[in-house]
Structure formats: C-alpha cells, structure tokens
C-alpha cells in the first residue's frame, strides 16, 4: 500500500473549520493548540456543518471523529484530541488513518475487514450515512446533543413561564381569601347566618354575582327585613324612609325597603304626582242653616 500524500477531505475540512478565527466563539483550539473545543453545539450544527459537510447532524460529525481516532477529553465539554491534529502542524494530518470497521456476514459467522478492501481515496468525506460506528463511538460524544440542548432550552422557558403563572395565581388567591373573609364577616354580622350554614356555603363554592341573592335567600339569611326590625321604622327618620334603604353585597342588591303606607291613608291620588285629595260633603246637614223669619242669613267669618 502506498503512503498517502494528502489528508482525508474530512480531516482537511475539520482543520480549516477549527483554525478559522472568525468562528472561535463556536469552535476553536484550546490554549496550547493540542485539542479543539466545540463551544456552541447548536450554532455549530445549524450554521457551520451545512457549510462544510452538507448536513447539520452533530452526532454524525462526532461519530466521524471517532472513526479517525479522535477521543473526547472530558465528559462535560465537547473537547476532542488526536496526537496528529495540532495547531500549526497541518502536515501531520496525513498520518491520521481511518479505523477499519468489522461487519459480520449474514450466512456464516465469518467477518470481513471492510477497510481492507477500501482504497485510501474513498475514505475521505463520507461523513454521516456511509460511515459505521466504531466501538469508540459509544462514548458520550456520540449522544444527540443538539436535540438535548433544544429540549433543555424549551424546558427552561417553560419553567420561567410557570413561575410567572404561579406568582399571578398566588396574588389572585390572596385577593380571593380577602373577599371570602369579608363575605363571612358580612353574613355573620348583618344577615345572621349560623356558622354551620357558612361552612355549607363555602363548601359549595363562591357564588357568582347573579346567583348571590338566591343563595342568601336559600339559607334564610335575608327574610322580611321589616318583620325582623332590621331597619329603623322611627317616625323621626321619615326623610330616610322616603329615600328608601337598600342592602347590597359586592354590588348586588339583596333587599330594598320601601316606605310603609299608614293604615288611615287614603289611596286616592290626583294627577301624576300622587298628591292626596280630601273630599267635603256640601250636602251635609251641618252645611244648611235655618234663620228666624224676618232676619237675613249671615255668614260669620
């Protein structure tokens, strides 16, 4: 077998990608130039891999590195090393050989070395579909990291959203408890609802504004307020009675007291203003006066 004079296309493109200073924020050499680090795997797979290798699969890139003898240095960082892949020593790339992969035949259990039948020319830029994983590809570097990073980002965003929703719900809960306490105090003080009845109301849930009056009437909280003497019927407060007293709960009218009508009041009215009218019987016997003969009738004022 003749000695290779040019590096494999995959190695050459990878070296150019790492050595490009314009992409150091995504992929670059380490400080001493003996390894290279992929700092941003998502941007690397999205922007750089399609430009150099016509695909965007970071896992395929890692598997291809494994077939050329690269190894992952630390588990928590995408840092790879090869003794013949160093900064400023591009000529060493020709010494990097593609590892031979062994495939088993379906008929009889014999194994054939696939790399032995392959020429040096076809072992270059076959990243992705043509290469099979070597035993070293089972290391952490072969994990589908871009997918996990995307999932982690989505989960982080969802977590922040849930935190905001939780804060908003906590604030609404405090407000609801405050309104509940006000309702219990009102029912106990003004409507005279027993504590066990309040517990039954609370177990049924907070009523809406439209059904609040029906619920209060159902538990017997508001009966006839005139009969209970809840309103002051004093004659000294006639002006207030003319206006009418109302009982509201959270803006819902529970009871309105109208002015009582006296037992001796005449119900006859005159005109639209409802003014009371009195009638006089001019034909009554007291309206007729008899005077002695010869004397004129006089009306005394």
UniProtKB/Swiss-Prot annotation:
Exhibits temperature-dependent phosphorylation. Its main location: nucleus. GO terms for biological process: regulation of transcription by RNA polymerase II. Residues 107-142 have a biased composition (Low complexity). Residues 103-160, 221-244 are annotated as: Disordered. Keywords: Activator, DNA-binding, Nucleus, Phosphoprotein, Stress response, Transcription, Transcription regulation. Pfam families: HSF_DNA-bind. One of its GO terms (cellular component) is nucleus. Residues 7-101 bind DNA. InterPro entries: HSF_DNA-bd, WH-like_DNA-bd_sf, WH_DNA-bd_sf. One of its GO terms (molecular function) is RNA polymerase II cis-regulatory region sequence-specific DNA binding. Residues 233-243 have a biased composition (Acidic residues). It is found in: Nucleus. Homotrimer. PANTHER family: HEAT SHOCK TRANSCRIPTION FACTOR, HEAT STRESS TRANSCRIPTION FACTOR B-1. DNA-binding protein that specifically binds heat shock promoter elements (HSE) and activates transcription. Belongs to the HSF family. This is Heat shock factor protein HSF24. It comes from Solanum peruvianum.
């Amino acid at each position: 077998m003749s000695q290779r004079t040019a590096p494999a296309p995959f190695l050459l493109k990878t070296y150019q990608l790492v050595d490009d200073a314009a992409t150091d924020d995504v992929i670059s050499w380490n400080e001493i130039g003996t390894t290279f680090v992929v700092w941003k795997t998502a941007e690397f797979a999205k922007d750089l891999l399609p430009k150099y290798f016509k695909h965007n699969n970071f896992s395929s890139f890692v598997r291809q590195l494994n077939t050329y003898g690269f190894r992952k240095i630390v588990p928590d960082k995408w840092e790879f090393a090869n003794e013949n892949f160093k900064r400023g020593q591009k000529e060493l790339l020709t010494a990097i050989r593609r590892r031979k992969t062994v495939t088993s035949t379906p008929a009889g259990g014999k194994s054939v070395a696939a790399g032995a039948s392959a020429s040096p020319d076809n072992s270059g830029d076959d990243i992705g579909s043509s290469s099979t994983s070597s035993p070293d590809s089972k290391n952490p570097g072969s994990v589908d990291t871009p997918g996990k990073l995307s999932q982690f980002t989505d989960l982080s965003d969802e977590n922040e959203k849930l935190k905001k929703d939780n804060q908003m719900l906590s604030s609404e809960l405090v407000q609801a408890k405050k309104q509940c306490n006000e309702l219990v105090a009102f029912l106990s003080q003004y409507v005279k609802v027993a504590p066990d009845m309040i517990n039954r109301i609370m177990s049924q849930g907070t009523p809406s504004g439209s059904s609040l009056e029906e619920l209060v009437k159902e538990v017997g909280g508001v009966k006839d307020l005139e009969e209970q003497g809840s309103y002051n019927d004093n004659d000294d407060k006639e002006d207030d009675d003319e206006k009418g007293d109302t009982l509201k709960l959270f803006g819902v009218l529970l009871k309105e007291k109208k002015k009582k009508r006296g037992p001796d009041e005449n119900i006859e009215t005159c005109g639209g203003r409802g003014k009371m009218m009195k009638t006089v019987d001019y034909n009554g016997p007291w309206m007729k006066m008899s005077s002695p003969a010869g004397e004129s009738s006089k009306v005394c004022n």
